[in-house]
């Protein structure tokens, strides 16, 4: 069947027609190498409609098809998706998707470069020898995968449109048009038509006007910052469109107030009039080289009548075995069956702020397991639900979107602000894992790539000792402190000096906390700050006796661990005993804390007191015993 090139296609594209789906011939293919501005190679085609020819840049997602020979000099192709941008006064066609109709053909017609003068037009050619290259244009297209399965027809005769024989009819692909809710909605500037809706993959900084239709898949909290310009606030949300393209949108200051409550995860929006800037890959894990920054003229409009064609979420799951070779700080998606969940524990950050941490373990069909660390609200919201499920002997499937790889003491995955957790999700990967686990996977041995976890969630780096071993093995008497974990019961708490008066003044963003004394003016004096205060703080300095089946010893618990043991602030107990003089109530609180068993992580170090050397044991972490995890740990010891 003869095939004809689409007449006047180059002219139509220059005039803004992006829905034509024309048949054109490839006259030249040239690879443009990498440079400092480009992160990867690009290809430039010379395409012709038989009369006019025009250079076109090919999006990087088509690189593999160019390298495999699907497109070559002389090929007849159909442009499926493309844009025409104005760059420095020159028109630039960017081909986002195309298909080969005929693999090879002689040059059709006598084409000339579009827009040349009559004199230049006399320089017709057969091939591309006399075609001057356009000005160099540099930009990067985001990497997006497109699947094209149609094989090109074979043995097709090719001719120019001047021949009256029947012509091949191009296939019609769905075009991107503004939805009905967008047309005639809101104020539009005079002589300004609504921007054409394009795929996220087609976005680049060289476009004047654009619009995208996409679903919000994730939304961050409002973050506040302070820099040389003053205080500010920012939030971001992630978008996913019909073609699987993803991009992050960021708003600052007044735009936070304008758009934060407007955007909602799961809803579809029409977004236009933002600026594109290079994505900050330290904070942005999406597979897109650009990021949208909304401006005062930007619009974000809800599409209430969306048809569900845009997926709810997009995953790119990695098997746990692959995570073992992933680089530190890699952002990835992982799915597995939860085998254990540890209790949530408070953690003091370097800035003095407290957060929570919860550790769980995942396994999958790859024969590997990995430790997952939940931080902050993930501990309470999702972590508690997972813990209840596992404690009731049900092991849920957990999908993690945008987890961060850590290589500290083996490989593990942790949550970040943009992480999303999906418990027992309804998609094929989850159903497959569920079936695998229920029909044999549960009893299949899995090697942990975290290396610091053992059955029951116990740390491999955790050194378990009993009380008698501390003295017998001379722990703490070397140059470096020893760190051990003891399962012991609190048998006695000294109450004569259970706390000390602490400095409440701030040094930077941290409280001083050094001991203060009464001055001559009856105020509190801090030698470190060299300042006086009207009030002081009260912080724990608990002397606690612990014992197990091998013996007993004394340990010291400071503020955070002291509060964990006593269950209330030191200031409350001080006021009860010394100010309110409620001795019996105070004694009852202390008695209530005795004879409870804990997992105590201790720092053991020899220190000098005058001329005497003493081994001091300080509590750095207090956990209630998780009997489910502890039973698994003890069973593992028996097996070994």
Swiss-Prot record:
Query: For this chain's UniProt record, which GO biological process terms are given?
Result: chiasma assembly; DNA repair; DNA replication; male gamete generation; male meiosis I; pollen development; reciprocal meiotic recombination
The UniProt entry, under InterPro entries, shows: Euk_RPA1_DBD_C, NA-bd_OB-fold, NA-bd_OB_tRNA, Rep_factor-A_C, Rep_factor-A_N, REPA_OB_2, Rfa1
Gene Ontology terms, MF aspect = DNA binding; zinc ion binding
DNA-binding region boundaries? 211-293
Does the record carry RNA-binding as a key word?
A: no
Zinc finger (C4-type) locations?
Answer: 503-529
> What GO CC terms are in its UniProt record?
chromatin; nucleus
Question: What Pfam families does the record tag this protein with?
Answer: Rep-A_N (PF04057), Rep_fac-A_C (PF08646), REPA_OB_2 (PF16900), tRNA_anti-codon (PF01336)
Question: Effect of gene disruption?
Answer: There are differing accounts of the mutant phenotypes. According to an early study with a limited number of progeny from different sources, it is embryonic lethal when homozygous. However, a more recent study describes homozygous lines that show normal vegetative growth, but reduced fertility and meiotic defects.
Q: Where in the cell is it found?
A: Nucleus
Q: Which CDD domains match?
A: RPA1_DBD_A, RPA1_DBD_B, RPA1_DBD_C, RPA1N
UniProt cross-references to SUPFAM superfamilies, sorted A to Z? Nucleic acid-binding proteins (SSF50249)
What induces this one?
By the genotoxic agents methyl methanesulfonate (MMS) and bleomycin.
Keywords linked to the UniProt accession: DNA damage, DNA recombination, DNA repair, DNA replication, DNA-binding, Metal-binding, Nucleus, Zinc, Zinc-finger
Tissues of expression: Expressed in roots, leaves, stalks and flower buds.
Q: Which NCBIfam families match?
A: rpa1 (TIGR00617)
Q: What is this protein's function per UniProt?
A: Component of the replication protein A complex (RPA) required for DNA recombination, repair and replication. The activity of RPA is mediated by single-stranded DNA binding and protein interactions. Plays an essential role at later stages of meiotic recombination events required for the formation of class I crossovers. Is essential for normal progression through meiosis in pollen mother cells. Is involved in repair of double-strand DNA breaks (DSBs) induced by genotoxic stresses, but does not seem to be required for the repair of meiotic DSBs.
Subunit organization: Heterotrimer of RPA1, RPA2 and RPA3 (canonical replication protein A complex). Interacts with RPA2A.
Q: Which family does it belong to?
A: Belongs to the replication factor A protein 1 family.
Protein name (record)? Replication protein A 70 kDa DNA-binding subunit A
The encoding gene = RPA1A
């Amino acid at each position: 069947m003869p095939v004809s090139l689409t007449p006047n296609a180059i002219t139509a594209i220059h005039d803004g027609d992006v829905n034509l789906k024309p048949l054109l011939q490839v006259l030249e293919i040239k690879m443009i190498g990498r440079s400092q501005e480009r992160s990867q190679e690009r290809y430039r085609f010379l395409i012709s409609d038989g009369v006019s020819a025009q250079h076109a840049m090919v999006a990087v997602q088509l690189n593999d098809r160019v390298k495999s020979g699907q497109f070559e000099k002389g090929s007849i192709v159909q442009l499926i998706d493309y844009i025409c941008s104005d760059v420095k006064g020159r028109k630039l066609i960017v081909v986002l998707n195309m298909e080969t109709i005929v693999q090879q053909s002689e040059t059709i017609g006598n084409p000339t470069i579009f827009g040349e003068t009559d004199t230049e037009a006399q320089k017709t050619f057969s091939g591309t020898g006399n075609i001057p290259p356009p000005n160099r244009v540099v930009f990067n297209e985001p990497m997006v995968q497109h699947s094209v399965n149609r094989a090109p027809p074979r043995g097709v005769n090719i001719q120019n449109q001047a021949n009256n024989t029947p012509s091949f009819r191009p296939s019609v692909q769905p075009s991107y048009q503004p939805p009905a809710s967008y047309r005639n909605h809101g104020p539009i500037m005079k002589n300004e038509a609504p921007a054409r809706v394009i795929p996220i993959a087609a976005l680049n900084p060289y476009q004047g006007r654009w619009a995208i239709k996409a679903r919000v898949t994730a939304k961050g909290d409002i973050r506040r910052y302070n820099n040389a310009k003053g205080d500010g606030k920012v939030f971001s949300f992630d978008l996913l469109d019909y073609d699987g393209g993803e991009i992050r949108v960021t708003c600052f200051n007044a735009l936070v107030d304008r758009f934060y409550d407007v955007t909602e995860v799961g809803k579809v929006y029409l977004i236009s009039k933002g600026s594109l800037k290079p994505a900050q890959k330290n904070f942005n894990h999406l597979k897109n080289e650009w990021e949208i920054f909304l401006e005062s003229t930007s619009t974000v409009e809800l599409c209430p009548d969306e048809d569900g064609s845009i997926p709810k979420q997009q995953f790119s799951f990695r098997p746990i075995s692959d995570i073992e070779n992933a680089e530190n700080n890699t952002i990835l998606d992982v799915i597995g069956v939860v085998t254990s969940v540890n209790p949530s524990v408070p953690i003091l950050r370097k800035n003095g702020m407290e957060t929570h941490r919860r550790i769980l373990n995942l396994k999958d069909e790859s024969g590997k397991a990995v430790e997952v660390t939940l931080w902050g609200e993930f501990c309470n919201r999702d972590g508690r639900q997972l813990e209840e499920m596992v404690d009731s002997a049900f092991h849920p499937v957990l999908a993690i979107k945008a987890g961060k790889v850590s290589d500290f003491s083996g490989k593990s995955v942790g949550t970040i602000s943009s992480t999303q957790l999906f418990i027992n999700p309804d998609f094929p990967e989850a159903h497959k894992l569920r079936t695998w686990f229920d029909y044999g996977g549960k009893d299949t041995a899995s090697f942990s790539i975290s290396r610091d976890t053992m059955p029951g969630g116990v740390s491999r780096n955790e050194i378990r000792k009993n009380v008698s071993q501390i003295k017998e093995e001379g722990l703490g008497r070397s140059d470096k402190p020893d760190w051990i974990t003891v399962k012991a019961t609190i048998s006695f708490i000294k109450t004569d000096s259970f706390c000390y008066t602490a400095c409440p003044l701030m040094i930077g963003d941290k409280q001083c906390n050094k001991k203060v004394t009464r001055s001559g003016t009856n105020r509190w004096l801090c030698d470190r700050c060299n300042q006086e205060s009207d009030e002081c703080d009260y912080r724990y300095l608990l002397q606690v006796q612990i014992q197990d089946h091998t013996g007993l010893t004394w340990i010291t618990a400071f503020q955070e661990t002291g509060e964990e043991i006593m269950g209330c602030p030191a200031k409350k107990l001080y006021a009860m005993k010394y100010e309110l003089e409620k001795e019996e109530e105070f004694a009852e609180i202390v008695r209530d804390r005795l004879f409870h068993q804990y997992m105590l992580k201790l720092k053991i170090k020899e220190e000098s007191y005058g001329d005497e050397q003493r081994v001091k044991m300080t509590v750095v972490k207090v956990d209630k015993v998780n009997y489910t995890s502890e039973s698994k740990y003890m069973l593992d010891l028996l097996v070994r």
